[in-house]
């Protein structure tokens, strides 16, 4: 059978079950208010990961512009050839200081960081233990590593302990999201750290959604839990969310970072981030550490939204993060609600399996410090109207 016919069959199958994904073309910069191709009016976006609203900050843009004038657009090669600029190096040092760790290492994307770390540290004869709701990049890293792959029930440390007790692997790595990207809840890091120590395992935390939003000065979930390098030897963070730029990093000991420079194939065999992105991230890191009002405002908006949903009897997940999903169940219902919200001026993406478990399609609502109280109030009013309308449609079927 030809490639074309096989792929057409796959695409048709996805369309038939409401799993076909498509892109929308933005006509304006990423922000709270966006113009989108096919829409006659501006949409208020409640689906971005720009949690602190730094992506369009004038100081971040200026840092990027100045560095681009000096370094040009591309880095030219990998970090180990001639692509490692002073901007990269200084950003790594500043991220290490920010996380309170001896060293940090930049990666081009969060996906590459997770793949590189897990594959660099594990192989045949080892074992990796992952929360069932971990991000795809963590799961893929574990599957490709060749290590024995275990998945424990979400935030269930007893289940994890049972798996660890049975393992005879030479190296054992526990891997979790700090804040789970689709549910918005946090990992039980204190219990996980205790389990790791008890069973002589290593703990890796992907705090992509915690950095900037949680902990003292936005230092993340690990910091919020009072854990140290000894508890969490491998800490990963992304730069494309609260930092508002692009890329990722891993922070840890001198030995860990030197080992990853040698062993992480996704670091060794790829072009370095543009120096201008590193310069912009240095500016956003400074803002993240000094403009505390952004986190304070974001947290106030989160509480406003959760209180409003409670008043409307809309059930939310147990999340205190900017990620506030409303689980709707069926894929078609989630798509319908997303469409109706767009008609009322809101851009909220419907998230469907396999990104989330079967039967848990949802609106993944995310809040930003750039939103206003009025934006959230308008969102709640629109949700109330749409949910009444959809409920009536379902009852009449």
UniProtKB/Swiss-Prot annotation:
Catalytic activity: 6-carboxyhexanoyl-[ACP] + L-alanine + H(+) = (8S)-8-amino-7-oxononanoate + holo-[ACP] + CO2
Needed cofactors: pyridoxal 5'-phosphate
Residues engaged in binding substrate: 21, 135, 355
GO MF annotation: an example: pyridoxal phosphate binding
Signal sequence annotation: none
EC category name: transferase
Residue positions binding pyridoxal 5'-phosphate: 110-111, 181, 209, 238
Domain of life: Bacteria
SUPFAM superfamilies xrefs: PLP-dependent transferases
GO biological processes: biotin biosynthetic process
EC number: 2.3.1.47
InterPro entries, per database record: Aminotrans_II_pyridoxalP_BS, Aminotransferase_I/II_large, AON_synthase_class-II, AONS_Archaea/Proteobacteria, AONS_Proteobacteria, PyrdxlP-dep_Trfase, PyrdxlP-dep_Trfase_major, PyrdxlP-dep_Trfase_small
Keywords, comma-separated and alphabetical: Biotin biosynthesis, Pyridoxal phosphate, Transferase
Residue list for modification N6-(pyridoxal phosphate)lysine: 241
Pfam families linked to this entry: Aminotran_1_2
Pathway: Cofactor biosynthesis; biotin biosynthesis
Protein family: Belongs to the class-II pyridoxal-phosphate-dependent aminotransferase family. BioF subfamily.
Function summary: Catalyzes the decarboxylative condensation of pimeloyl-[acyl-carrier protein] and L-alanine to produce 8-amino-7-oxononanoate (AON), [acyl-carrier protein], and carbon dioxide.
HAMAP family membership: BioF_aminotrans_2 (MF_01693)
Subunit structure as annotated in this protein's UniProt entry: Homodimer.
Protein name, per record: 8-amino-7-oxononanoate synthase
Record organism: Saccharophagus degradans (strain 2-40 / ATCC 43961 / DSM 17024)
Lineage: Bacteria, Pseudomonadati, Pseudomonadota, Gammaproteobacteria, Cellvibrionales
């Amino acid at each position: 059978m030809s490639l074309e016919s096989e792929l057409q069959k796959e695409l048709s199958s996805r369309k038939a079950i409401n799993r076909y994904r498509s892109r929308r073309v933005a006509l304006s910069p990423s922000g709270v208010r966006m113009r989108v191709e096919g829409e006659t009016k501006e949409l208020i976006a409640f689906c971005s990961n720009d949690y602190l609203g730094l992506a369009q900050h004038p100081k971040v843009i200026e840092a990027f512009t100045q560095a681009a004038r000096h370094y040009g657009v591309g880095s030219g090669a990998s970090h180990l050839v001639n692509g490692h600029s002073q901007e990269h190096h200084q950003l790594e040092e500043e991220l290490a200081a920010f996380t309170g760790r001896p060293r940090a290492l930049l990666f081009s994307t969060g996906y590459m960081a997770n793949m590189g770390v897990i594959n660099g540290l594990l192989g045949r004869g080892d074992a990796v233990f992952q929360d069932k709701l971990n991000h795809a990049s963590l799961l893929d890293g574990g599957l490709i590593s060749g290590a024995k792959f275990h998945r424990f029930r979400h935030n269930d440390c007893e289940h994890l302990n049972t798996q660890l007790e049975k393992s005879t692997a030479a190296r054992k790595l526990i891997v979790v999201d700090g804040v789970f990207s689709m549910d918005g809840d946090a990992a039980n890091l204190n219990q996980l750290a205790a389990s790791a120590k008890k069973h002589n395992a290593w703990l890796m935390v992907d705090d992509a959604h915690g950095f900037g939003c949680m902990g003292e000065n936005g230092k993340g979930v690990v910091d919020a839990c009072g854990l140290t390098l000894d508890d969490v030897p491998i800490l990963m963070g992304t730069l494309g969310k609260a930092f508002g730029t692009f890329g990722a990093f891993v922070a840890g000991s001198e030995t860990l970072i030197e080992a990853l420079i040698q062993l992480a194939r996704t670091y060794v065999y790829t072009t370095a981030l543009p120096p201008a992105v590193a310069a912009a991230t240095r500016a956003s890191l400074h803002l993240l550490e000094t403009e505390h009002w952004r986190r304070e405002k974001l947290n106030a908006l989160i509480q406003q939204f959760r209180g409003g949903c409670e008043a409307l009897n809309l059930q939310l997940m147990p999340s205190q993060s900017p990620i506030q999903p409303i689980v709707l169940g069926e894929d078609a219902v989630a798509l319908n609600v997303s469409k109706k919200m767009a008609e009322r001026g809101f851009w909220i993406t419907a998230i469907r399996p396999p990104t989330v478990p079967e039967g848990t399609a949802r609106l993944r609502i995310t809040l930003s410090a750039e939103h206003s109280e009025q934006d959230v109030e308008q969102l709640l009013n629109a949700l109330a109207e749409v949910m009444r309308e959809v409920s009536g449609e379902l009852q009449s079927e």
